[in-house]
Design a protein with these regions (language model features):
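Sec-dependent signal peptide recognition
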Residues: 2-9
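C-terminal motif of bacterial Sec signal peptides marking the signal peptidase cleavage site
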Residues: 14-16
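Bacterial signal peptide processing site
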Residues: 18-20
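Short, surface-exposed polybasic-aromatic patches that bind anionic ligands, especially phosphate groups
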Residues: 30-334
Length: 334
């Protein structure tokens, strides 16, 4: 989201922040224009990047899909973790069931075919938004809480459409900002531009999805939030505050320490923990400290997810990723 903005599948949503001041129509169950996310979730063959509904979730050589378990520790690791909260616990901000009136997690919609209506969205930050149009299905899965994110994958062209603060009133969609991503491309947002996330990054590639856990392997970094950020580093493109010593920037990558013993956790949680060791977590938005993002799914076991609450900042370390960069305007890695 942009500097003026924000602290800020199954087909449902996240509970977050405070309610928006503008009234919003309560999302209803997706109509036939939305294909079941569970039915279309695909797990890529070994060596490939993540995939969804026969579309890649960015190329295999994208920074989101790159392991960081052998990279050096970032020189600011200790300071950043102290700033966020070394002894503060993690929280998996997704699950099954509902909370505060809506399902728990960030939803995504999968659409395709001529029946999908494309909408011109009226943005209140148009200077950093992609004009569209946006293929928004009737009654889309939308994030509950204050951010009202809508995420849509169009299988016709394998493009990802993301909107922040989406509101539908009087037959017209409006929003704070919007971004369109070619899922076959490593191109980043223009430098200093927001997206539907404060870091100027896409949201979908960082979501934990139940089908990945079911398949036994997650091959991408995971989105998370903290309260205070300053500046931004590659691959992020946007900041909510100017750089400050010791305050983590948008785009910072962290990983679970290699010696953290995961053997006592249930197998499903070990899949998530291995991903945190191998691919790490990416700071993408302002929110509660150490809140980890995922897509809602009735198959999640919330009690099991709460076992990960025992993770603390002290179990992680920041990673130096700049050596992987090929071009500052690309997510491609060496």
């Amino acid at each position: 989201m942009n500097t003026k903005i924000f602290l800020s599948v199954s087909l449902f949503l996240l509970s977050a922040c405070s309610p928006a001041s503008t009234p919003i129509e309560t999302p209803q169950p997706p109509t036939a224009t939305v294909v079941s996310a569970n039915a279309l979730t695909s797990v890529a063959p070994a060596g490939d990047g993540p995939a969804l509904a026969n579309c890649p979730i960015f190329p295999a050589d994208n920074i989101w899909n790159t392991r960081v378990d052998t990279l050096p520790i970032h020189p600011m690791s200790e300071a950043w973790i102290d700033n966020i909260g070394r002894d503060e616990g993690f929280h998996m901000d997704f699950g099954s069931g509902s909370w505060d009136g809506g399902p728990i997690g960030i939803p995504y919609n999968v659409v395709g075919g001529s029946s999908v209506t494309k909408h011109t969205v009226e943005f209140y930050y148009p200077d950093e938004s992609d004009a569209g149009p946006y293929p928004i299905p009737e009654n889309p899965g939308m994030e509950y809480g204050s951010d009202h994110h809508i995420l849509v994958v169009n299988t016709d062209d394998c493009k990802l459409y993301e909107i922040y603060d989406a509101i539908y009133e009087n037959g017209v969609w409006s929003g704070g900002s919007g971004a369109i991503w070619d899922l076959h491309s490593n191109a980043l947002r223009p430098d200093t531009w927001t997206s539907a996330d404060a870091a100027g990054l896409p949201i979908l590639p960082g979501l934990l999805r139940y089908d990945e856990v079911l398949a036994g392997e997650i091959r991408h970094a995971i989105r998370f939030t903290v309260e205070n950020t300053a500046g931004y580093i590659w691959p992020a493109r946007h900041q909510t505050d100017d750089p400050q010593d010791g305050v983590p920037p948008m785009g910072a990558r962290f990983r679970l320490k290699a010696d953290y013993d995961i053997s006592s956790f249930p197998p499903e949680m070990q899949v998530i923990l291995r991903a945190m060791k191998e691919y790490g977590i990416i700071l993408a938005d302002n929110g509660s400290n150490w809140y980890v993002s995922g897509a809602p799914d009735e198959r999640w076991d919330n009690d099991m997810l709460h076992l990960l609450d025992m993770l603390t900042g002290n179990d992680f370390e920041a990673v130096a990723t700049s050596m992987l960069m090929v071009d500052p305007n690309s997510g491609e890695v060496k």
